[in-house]
């Protein structure tokens, strides 16, 4: 082939370099809205029903923490043993929820609560012992060296 003809063909299909427009790459972002729609459609097929008047939901984890949902929306399908919770979950320690959560605790959670109470009492004893030692050390006044009188040095 002729070199001039080849150069003209290359110039017409030039992709990059000086003087060529930039090509924008189209990026497709997958939104979470599509996932929510799929989930809603699946739940609708399972014939879930809303459950009213649920004030809070607590899920107990193995490490002793609790996932707490305040005023969630709850849907359930009893025949398929499926429950859906909608809301913002917060991870909290068991001690933060203790007064109102005692009637919800099962045997496993009660055991972890006992362990937590024992460790808390031990921490209190250790702190009290350490505070007592610090007070004794601060109250100690160093003894004066025999034969020295500091009052005479002041004058």
From Swiss-Prot:
Which Pfam families does the entry link to?
NAC (PF01849)
Provide this UniProt record's keywords sorted from A to Z: Cytoplasm, Nucleus, Protein transport, Repressor, Transcription, Transcription regulation, Transport
Biological process per Gene Ontology, one example term: protein transport
Q: Which domain of life is it from?
A: Eukaryota
Q: Where is the NAC-A/B domain?
A: 33-98
PROSITE patterns listed in its UniProt record: NAC_AB
Q: Which InterPro entries does this chain map to?
A: BTF3, NAC_A/B_dom_sf, Nas_poly-pep-assoc_cplx_dom
Q: Give the span(s) annotated as Disordered.
A: 1-35, 116-155
Composition bias (Acidic residues) maps to: 136-155
Q: Does the keyword Ion transport apply?
A: no
The cellular location(s) given in this protein's UniProt record come to: Cytoplasm; Nucleus
Q: Where is the composition biased (Basic residues)?
A: 20-30
Give GO cellular component annotations, separated by semicolons: nascent polypeptide-associated complex; nucleus
Task performed by this protein: Component of the nascent polypeptide-associated complex (NAC), a dynamic component of the ribosomal exit tunnel, protecting the emerging polypeptides from interaction with other cytoplasmic proteins to ensure appropriate nascent protein targeting. The NAC complex also promotes mitochondrial protein import by enhancing productive ribosome interactions with the outer mitochondrial membrane and blocks the inappropriate interaction of ribosomes translating non-secretory nascent polypeptides with translocation sites in the membrane of the endoplasmic reticulum.
Instruction: List the PANTHER family.
Output: TRANSCRIPTION FACTOR BTF3 FAMILY MEMBER
Q: How does it assemble?
A: Part of the nascent polypeptide-associated complex (NAC), consisting of egd2 and egd1. NAC associates with ribosomes via egd1.
Q: Which family does it belong to?
A: Belongs to the NAC-beta family.
- What is the protein name for this chain? Nascent polypeptide-associated complex subunit beta
Name of the coding gene: egd1
